[in-house]
Design a protein with these regions (language model features):
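A juxtamembrane structural motif centered on a specific transmembrane helix
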Residues: 147-165, 169, 173, 315-348
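N-terminal signal-anchor transmembrane alpha helix
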Residues: 15-42, 180-192
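Membrane-interface loop-to-helix entry segments
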Residues: 68-87, 129-143, 240-258, 303-312
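Short, Lys/Arg-rich, polar N-terminal cytosolic tail immediately upstream
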Residues: 1-12
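Membrane-interface helix-loop-helix junctions at transmembrane boundaries of multi-pass membrane enzymes
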Residues: 92-106, 168, 260-279, 341-343
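Extracytosolic (periplasmic/ER-lumenal) interhelical loops and adjacent juxtamembrane/interface segments
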Residues: 37-72, 197-238
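Interfacial helix-loop-helix junctions of multi-pass membrane proteins
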Residues: 36-45, 113-136, 191-201, 287-311
Length: 348
């Protein structure tokens, strides 16, 4: 019996370690994709699934130059993540006793297959719209792997994620913040793939105003000046997409501040306070990076870091919501002591 338990524990540790490896590789893939988009080299390799007629895995290293290097490396990393995910899904089906975790593994495998197809279609059909969906699915897939990694951890098995946190309002605020971040990432992906990142070249104002004038005559004047400064013309739609991006950024910051304040008032949820403070710091840094992206004339490295921190902000939001959900569910199986109930009633 002891040897069976030891073998089971070893398998659990193994699948958890593999989950971590897959998660880290996926983050590397996200950063790689961000570099490709930031540098505008997504079409450096115009064919798919081949690379200039070669089998993707046999393309000679001598051809890895310029933009081809970034796009081809992105494809190879993506292939590796696909293989890692396939093994992870099969491993979960083989050893995981919980059906919902098995299902997450299958969903992850389907998602990575669809993601690869979207990446190929983005090249084959040369459609920016596909690139936007490709970016959003990548973010969602990353978060899904995070849930799988947590669910396979020894701490999760021991009930460490089921500590009673009796605050549904905190969960709703965290969920609202996370949804806003996803909307923000959608706007960011649209800006990146529609090349609207510098539709407004100044910050915090927009063409010297709080709200830019995009009437036809004003837009003509804007584009005349942009052409004089050797900047490609823009459109009213691109300008307002960036304004929406800025507006949602303010909404996210205020929402995460409300999460931190709510956690601070809940004496029972000290763990939630640490999470929310880290989250707030990430959002603050993200706002600074967004400003720096504009001030640096959308430097590729700054824009990529901005994208990567956005992915981590969404990731933390999803994991935080999952943590709060488990904490509230734990209330079905335990009754808080009198002091805990009194502490909660003071903020409810």
């Amino acid at each position: 019996m002891g040897s069976q338990n030891s073998s089971l524990d070893l398998r659990r540790v193994g699948v958890h370690a593999w989950s971590w490896f897959t998660l880290a590789s996926t983050f590397l893939l996200l950063c790689s994709g961000g570099i490709v988009t930031s540098k505008g080299v997504g079409m450096s390799v115009p064919d798919w699934p081949t690379t200039y007629g070669y089998n993707m895995f046999l393309f000679p290293i001598s051809g890895w130059v310029g933009g081809i290097f970034y796009e081809h490396a992105h494809r190879l990393i993506a292939s590796g993540v696909g293989l890692l995910t396939m093994i992870l899904a099969a491993w979960l089906l083989a050893v995981e006793p919980r059906r919902w975790v098995k299902n997450l593994g299958v969903i992850a495998f389907v998602a990575v297959c669809v993601q690869g197809l979207l990446g190929g279609l983005r090249v084959s059909l040369f459609k920016d719209e596909i690139g936007i969906f490709h970016a959003l699915l990548a973010q969602s897939f990353f978060c899904l792997l995070g849930i799988i990694t947590i669910a396979t951890s020894p701490k999760f098995f021991r009930g460490g994620w089921d500590v009673f946190i009796p605050d549904p309002v905190l969960k709703k605020l965290a969920l609202l913040s996370t949804v806003l971040i996803f909307v923000q990432l959608a706007l960011g992906a649209t800006m990146r793939h529609e090349h609207a990142g510098l539709a407004i070249p100044d910050f915090p104002l927009a063409y010297g105003e709080i709200l830019p004038d995009t009437a036809p005559t004003a837009l003509d004047a804007i584009n005349t000046k942009r052409l004089a400064d050797d900047i490609v013309p823009t459109s009213a739609a691109q300008i307002w997409i960036q304004m929406a991006h800025r507006g949602v950024a303010i909404g996210i910051f205020l929402a995460v501040v409300s999460v931190a304040l709510r956690a601070f008032r809940n004496l029972v949820a000290r763990r939630a306070l640490v999470w929310s403070c880290i989250w707030l710091l990430m959002i603050f840094c993200q706002v600074l990076l967004g400003a720096w992206t504009i001030w640096s004339n959308k430097a590729a490295d700054v824009a990529t870091i901005h994208m990567a921190l956005g992915a981590l902000s969404l990731f933390l939001g999803v994991i935080f919501c999952f943590r709060l959900h488990r904490g509230i569910q734990a209330g079905r199986f335990c009754v808080p002591d009198t002091q805990t109930a009194r502490d909660f009633s003071s903020i409810a």
